[in-house]
Amino acid sequence: MYTEEDGYLYNKEKVKEKVIETIDNCIKLKLYVIIDWHILSDNNPNIHKQEAIEFFDDISKIYGKNNNVIYEICNEPNGDDVRWKSSVYPYAKDVIEVIRKNSPDSIIIVGTPDWCKSILEVIGNQLPYKNIMYAFHFYSGTHGELYRKSLEYAIENGVPVFVSEWGTSTAENGTSIFEEESDKWVEFLNNKGISWVNWSFSNKDEATSILKKETKTLNDENLTKSGLYVKKKIQEKLLTTNK
């Protein structure tokens, strides 16, 4: 759920109704659902902290006992002056306090600076709550071995990681996907036991969209090259998990 970009802040009740509808459908289907406070152009999560507190208070009151509901409280903090200790940590602490009153044990994902790349800033500065995870994002055509080493170092130093967004293209989204580099990333994540979510379940004219633009039904014919790739990776993981 975008905060700006014509999102929640511009039509709170309508957008919240759509979020609730989506969550309810996921619960019926016995799926995990991540409620994503998707900041982007607003850069610093503190700009709309009060609105985030109100939103997550409302939503966690409804779904506080649903263990398949995950709260992601600030997608991709960004901007040179938006750092973990000075900006994201104090924001997260205030929002988590509200969620924990309604949902003591739910998983909460917290974004990290530089569009969820600077996860090393979390080392030694984790939030004082249980079931907190820290977001890391990448795009296979842009972020390679150096980023995997950074992520591995964070894990080795006790940072619980959730890759809540990754794409098969470049960070600029481009027109091509990078299967070989994506293979390296997926193998790395699976070997480390890191959960991941692919961007994105949409039919936008972007390389990372899994659906073709004129899609009306969900079948392989309507999946993009990226969609077919991601479906294959999910199926491979399921086969491994269910052995």
Which residue stretches match the model-derived regions?
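Extracellular glycoside hydrolase catalytic/binding regions
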Residues: Y32, K49-I70, C74-K204, T208-T240
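Extracellular carbohydrate-recognition regions
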Residues: K243
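Localized chelating/binding microdomains
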Residues: Y2-E4, D42, V69, N78
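Short acidic-hydrophobic catalytic motif
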Residues: P45
